[in-house]
Every structure is written in structure tokens, then in C-alpha cells.
Amino acid sequence: MGISRDSRHKRRLTGGRYPVHKKKRKYELGRPSSNTKLGSRLVRKVRCRGGNLKFRALRLDSGNFSWGSQNVTRKTRVMDVVYNASSNELVRTKTLVKNAIVTVDPTPFKLWFKTHYGVELEDPQASEKVAGLVPKTLLEQFSSGRLLACISSRPGQCGRCDGYVLEGEELNFYRRRMDKKKRV
């Protein structure tokens, strides 16, 4: 049968059916979703229209995440999927999609911070210097060992899981959303 992106199968406004006057075409082709899971890296190549390639990530465990306020990007491990505005099912099954909120390992960012500023993030003696550079909400996450981040790439299409560390108003927004979900 095949997945088709046509509109010939749709009904009219009145509820009647349109007469089907042609077969499915290759250019109307659709494919099943990749539903990229959290696990050891497994990426497949898919030939698309025009001979282009899409990289269908079936499993991913790491990606490039950038820390916007410090202007630094590091490859880090994705630990868990914690929130998805689209569906709770995607959180339960740990599916990586664009705009999913995940927790990432903060170790690469800690190492960069130490080499760049010469101060450790959790050092109590240098707390005044760190406080001016890193907000308190982010420091709490660094000490807990889990940074909240948002996926900005499309793992099912480009085969990568890249994103950015949540900060400021956006971090507060998603924290409120997750707290609300926990209470319900």
C-alpha cells in the first residue's frame, strides 16, 4: 500500500468521497517516522528525491550542545528526555525529536569553565567570581550533574542531536511546565 501524502483520499466538505481518478505517484511518497530513541548510535542513510540523502537516526546517545551566554559548544552525552510539548508518549518512550527538553552531562562544560576562567564551578572560595558569570539556577543544575537542554536539530532527518543549554526565562518556563506535569 505505502504511505502517501496526497489529498485524493480526503472527503468533501459535505462528507462525500471524491472519485479517485489516478494512482499514487512517486512524488507523493511518505515514509514512516524514525522515532529516534536514546541509545548507542545507529544512523541509516535514506535516498530522497533528487538523489539527496537524509540521515535517519534510529538511536543516538550524544550531541553538540551550546552554552549561549558563554559562547561555547561541546559534545556531551544525552542522559534522559524529560519534557515534550507535543506528547507525553514521546517522553515515556525517550524519543528524541526537535524541541524536546533533555538532560545532558555537564562535565565538558565544567572542564571548559575551569580551563577558561581558572575557577571550578563548585568551588566555595571562588563563589563570588562564579556568581557574576553563571546564574544561580544554572549553578544548581551543574551541582546536580544534569543540565536541561533543548534539541534544535532534527534527529530523524539530519542524523544528529544538537541543541542548546536552557538559560534565563526559557529555563524558568520549562521548569514551571515540568513542575505542573509532576503535580497532575
From Swiss-Prot:
Pfam families according to UniProt: Ribosomal_S8e (PF01201)
Keywords, sorted A to Z: Ribonucleoprotein, Ribosomal protein
Gene Ontology CC terms, in alphabetical order: ribonucleoprotein complex; ribosome
One of the protein's GO biological processes: translation
InterPro entries xrefs: Ribosomal_eS8, Ribosomal_eS8_CS, Ribosomal_Se8/biogenesis_NSA2
GO MF annotation list: structural constituent of ribosome
UniProt biased composition (Basic residues): 7-23
Region annotated Disordered, chain positions: 1-23
Annotated family: Belongs to the eukaryotic ribosomal protein eS8 family.
Protein name: Small ribosomal subunit protein eS8
Species of provenance: Theileria annulata
Organism ancestry: Eukaryota, Sar, Alveolata, Apicomplexa, Aconoidasida
